[in-house]
Amino acid sequence: MTSEQIPNRVLLFDGVCNLCNGAVQFIIKRDPDGLISFTSLQSETGQSLLKKSGLPTDRFDSFVFIEDGQVYTKSTAAIKVFRHLRGPWRLFVLFFAVPKPVRDMVYSFIAKNRYKWFGKKNECMLPSPSIKKRFLP
């Protein structure tokens, strides 16, 4: 996939993480205009985007949100995504008032325990036909 084919907003997520997959489903329901596209961190496109962004390709402990060429990780990525959702979810931008080290500490604690608390799949989720167009290969 060339850089011209990459949408303006892409969320990279851990494709085997149940919590992450649930978050993607949550986002899709609240982004009916399809402003955000998705790819797993483990996918060919995800790996390519991680490399281009100078991020490690073997650690899957953070959402990565790429918006208009800017790369965001951890709590900042999550808050940036919420900014595009319909309804009261946009109010999550208020968390930008919390210092980034504190936000990222909480994010990292959840990320570290996500498999223990929510489980994981053996392989990446396959999107249903109705949402497949939102997922990059």
Swiss-Prot record:
One GO MF term: protein-disulfide reductase activity
Pfam families xref list: DCC1-like (PF04134)
Family per similarity comment: Belongs to the DCC thiol-disulfide oxidoreductase family.
PANTHER family assigned: DUF393 DOMAIN-CONTAINING PROTEIN, THIOL-DISULFIDE OXIDOREDUCTASE DCC
Name the record gives this protein: Uncharacterized protein YuxK
Source species of the chain: Bacillus subtilis (strain 168)
Gene: yuxK
